[in-house]
Amino acid sequence: MYQIGEALIGEGNEVAHIDLLIGDKNGPVGIAFANGMTQLSMGHTPLLAVVRPNLIPKPATLIVPKVTVKNMGQAAQIFGPAQAAVAKAVADAVEEGVVPKDLCEDVVIIVSVFIHPEAQDPTKIYKYNYGATKLALTRAMEKFPGVDKVTYEKDRGVHAIMGYKITRLWDAPYLQIAIDAPDLGVVERVLKNVPKNDHLIIEAGTPLIKRYGLSVISKIREIRKDAFIVADLKTLDTGNLEARMAADNLADAVVCSGLAPIATIEKFIEEARKVGIYSIIDTLNVENPAKLIAALKVKPDIVELHRGIDTESQSAEHAWGNIPEIKKAAGGKKLLVAVAGGVKVENVETALKGGADILVVGRSITNAKDIEGESRRFLQAMKKDEIDQYRIMTDF
């Protein structure tokens, strides 16, 4: 046996965070247990859990302090409420059948315990560590979480210390607001007025980047640190280099022109994948987007069907094309399709029914007197609830 469990319970300085291993005495957990008892580390001295002096729980449990113990007051918290809490949690877990009794002499447990240096309340330390240890042990025995649970939760939660969530594009449709005006004042005004929403993307447009460089991405990030930011470079050469530059400047996605050589596009996609950002192929002036995608050995994450600003005055039709055909050309890879040019509140439903995943809107929002109101009109037309808007949860 080699099982792993984790749990966080409580609040304030007494919060308990438990990392736990349970495994066979003659396996790696047993070896680690013996090493912990015989190879001591200053400030992190392992100790056996005891229900009370002279009474260890079964399975035998070793406590390892995560935070350096610097004085006798902190030592008393580990050798007092934390030690008792962990031991009692293990003993109760056996009594309740979480750990089968017939395993108790064959396995050992290692529990890594967090005690904040400013923790004060011994009752909270006990209660929180008891609950967290018992929960971590239960999760270890149940092999929680399963892969499906992790997949479901990974893009929903916010890490407590980080404090905000970096958006990934898994819950289409999305509204992408393109800021093309090469004016930092406009950028700031737009960013401060667009609503916070799980289905909103910010695009640093090509003219904006040409004036200020990719460092403008970092400026956008300063104002909206949790935003999903697209760098519209319209790369035509050195695809791998420009994709890496966008990632280094904190972009979440980067755009390559579909008019670039195939080799450039493929290097661009590979580099974007390597650095963990989305690759977007802009098909402005590409005659057959589906044919282009089919020709690529590696497929992008997003294809943008784009009618340019300069053709709007000519009453050109939008370039949305046959979206299902483009997705089919990806050969089974999950492909998002963005539509840009001619997107209005009135045709949002038509675009979505046609298969669009991302609606790119520029001046209709960025030039509006009521930026927030206009943004909300598009979001409402998309008829998409916020992620977990109606979910009431503790940890799950």
Curated annotation (Swiss-Prot):
Binding, substrate: D19, L48, K66, T68, Q83
A Pfam family of the record is Fae
Keywords, comma-separated and alphabetical: Carbohydrate metabolism, Lyase, Multifunctional enzyme
SUPFAM superfamilies in the record: Ribosomal protein S5 domain 2-like (SSF54211), Ribulose-phoshate binding barrel (SSF51366)
- The ranges of region (3-hexulose-6-phosphate synthase) come to 162-396
Database matches in CDD domains: KGPDC_HPS
InterPro entries in alphabetical order: Aldolase_TIM, Fae/Hps, HCHO-activating_enzyme, HCHO-activating_enzyme_sf, HPS/KGPDC, OMPdeCOase_dom, Ribosomal_Su5_D2-typ_SF, RibuloseP-bd_barrel
The reaction(s) annotated as catalysed by this protein in its Swiss-Prot or TrEMBL entry are: 5,6,7,8-tetrahydromethanopterin + formaldehyde = 5,10-methylenetetrahydromethanopterin + H2O; D-ribulose 5-phosphate + formaldehyde = D-arabino-hex-3-ulose 6-phosphate
Q: Where is the active site?
A: H17
From the Swiss-Prot or TrEMBL record, give the protein name: Bifunctional enzyme Fae/Hps
The Enzyme Commission number assigned here is 4.2.1.147, 4.1.2.43
| Protein function | Catalyzes the condensation of formaldehyde with tetrahydromethanopterin (H(4)MPT) to 5,10-methylenetetrahydromethanopterin. Catalyzes the reversible formation of ribulose-5-phosphate and formaldehyde from 3-hexulose-6-phosphate.
Extract the SMART domains matched here.
Answer: OMPdecase
Q: Cite the annotated pathway.
A: Carbohydrate biosynthesis; D-ribose 5-phosphate biosynthesis
Per its record, what are the GO molecular function terms? 3-dehydro-L-gulonate-6-phosphate decarboxylase activity; carbon-nitrogen lyase activity; hexulose-6-phosphate synthase activity; hydro-lyase activity; orotidine-5'-phosphate decarboxylase activity
Per the record, the similarity remark reads:
In the N-terminal section; belongs to the formaldehyde-activating enzyme family. In the C-terminal section; belongs to the HPS/KGPDC family. HPS subfamily.
- Which BP terms in the Gene Ontology apply to this protein? 'de novo' pyrimidine nucleobase biosynthetic process; carbohydrate biosynthetic process; L-ascorbic acid catabolic process
Region described as Formaldehyde-activating enzyme: spans on this chain: 1-161
By its UniProt entry, which HAMAP family does this protein fall under? Fae_Hps (MF_01268)
Indicate the enzyme's highest-level EC class: lyase
**Gene3D superfamilies (alphabetical):** Aldolase class I, Formaldehyde-activating enzyme
The protein's matches in PANTHER family, at most eight in alphabetical order, are given as: 3-KETO-L-GULONATE-6-PHOSPHATE DECARBOXYLASE SGBH-RELATED
